[in-house]
Amino acid sequence: MTSTTTDNATTVATIYRAFGAGDVDTLMGLIAQDVRWESDWEDNFAQRAGGPAFYRPLHGRDQLGTFFEAMGANTFHQLEVRDVIADGDRAVARVALEYTMPSGGRYRDEQLHLWTFDGDGKVIAIRHFLDTAKLLAATRGEDTTAGPS
C-alpha cells in the first residue's frame, strides 16, 4: 500500500467523522472545488424517479450545501463506517446507515461509497451504491427497516 493510498483512506475516515459531528468546514477543506457528486451515473433511475435531494447530481463544491442541508433534515439513528479500502486514487467505504426522513419514512441500508481523489489528496468525485428501491420507499414515507436488512 502506498502512502497516497493510506492518506486517501485516512481522508475518507476523517470525512465521516466530520460528517457525524456536523463539521462542514473540515469536510469542505477535503473536497476539491470542481467535485462531482453523484454525477457520473449513465442512467440512475432513482435520480429520475423523484429520489431525495441529497441523491441528485451536484457539480462543484459550492453546490454541496444542497446535499448537507437535505441530509441534515434526516434524523440519524446510525452512521457506522465498517471498512475503508483504498487503492491508488480511489477509496471505497462500506457504511451502515439508518435514519428517519422528513416524510416519516425510515431507511436502513448498508452502502458502498466510492471516493476519487486528485493528486493533492482532495475528493474530486463521490458515488453512492445503495438499495435505491428502499431509498425511494422511505422517501414516500415507508418504513424500510421491517425485517432483516
Could you say what each language-model-derived stretch is?
Residues M1-Q33, D143-S149:
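Short, low-complexity N-terminal intrinsically disordered segments enriched in polar/charged residues
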Residues T2-D7, E69-S149:
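A beta-strand edge to alpha-helix "cap/lid" segment located at domain peripheries
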Residues S3, A18, F54-Y55, I126:
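Short N-terminal micro-motifs specific to bacterial/archaeal maturation
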Residues V12-I15, L27, V35, G60, ...:
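Hydrophobic pocket/interface hotspot
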Residues A18-M28, G50-A53, F68-G72, R94:
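Short, mixed-charge, low-aromatic patches
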Residues A21, H59, S103:
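Short glycine-rich loop/turn motifs that provide flexible caps or phosphate-binding loops at active sites
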